[in-house]
Amino acid sequence: MDADSDVALDILITNVVCVFRTRCHLNLRKIALEGANVIYKRDVGKVLMKLRKPRITATIWSSGKVICTGATSEEEAKFGARRLARCLQKLGFQVIFTDFKVVNVLAVCNMPFEIRLPEFTKNNRPHASYEPELHPAVCYRIKTLRATLQIFSTGSITVTGPNVKAVASAVEQIYPFVFESRK
């Protein structure tokens, strides 16, 4: 088994965070009273709204900014954001769906082997940091992709990046390094 051989690694996307604007002021009290599946957090000045399909939780501010979390793909995130905008339109707001952007993607990938973390950290010192007293994983940052990887000794890798393509590239880029330090 060598690092160059094509190994099919399953990258499971667990969370996609996206943002969009409604281009109108939103009355949070009206959303709280008339909307479905809503939690009004008056002390913070926001409303949480949940959709069942796709399973998304949205944080809505009176300025018209909406953050959606919980989607499992970029397409599902956009679909859920548009459904949310439609729900707000049905409540009587003049919503215009604009400035949609995927801001964060969280994914999990399992390597087919275990990893020696101290050796991995020593070999990749400027990018990797390992504090076993604080956290059981190595934190590895790839600045060019704006991705952060949490590498565990079991071979599980949690990747956070700005989009799905960056997450996939980060896993491809890290594979030869973790392969060198396998148990």
Swiss-Prot record:
InterPro entries (UniProt xref): TBP (IPR000814), TBP-like (IPR015445), TBP_dom_sf (IPR012295)
Expression sites by tissue: Present in the brain, heart, liver and gizzard.
GO molecular function (one): RNA polymerase II core promoter sequence-specific DNA binding
Subcellular localization(s) per the UniProt record: Cytoplasm; Nucleus
Keywords: Cytoplasm, DNA-binding, Nucleus, Transcription, Transcription regulation
GO CC list: cytoplasm; male germ cell nucleus; transcription factor TFIIA complex
Keyword presence, Iron: no
Main location: cytoplasm
Protein name: TATA box-binding protein-like 1
Organism: Gallus gallus (Chicken)
Protein purpose: Part of a specialized transcription system that mediates the transcription of most ribosomal proteins through the 5'-TCT-3' motif which is a core promoter element at these genes. Seems to also mediate the transcription of NF1. Does not bind the TATA box.
Taxonomy, superkingdom: Eukaryota
Record SUPFAM superfamilies: TATA-box binding protein-like (SSF55945)
Complex formation: Binds TFIIA and TFIIB.
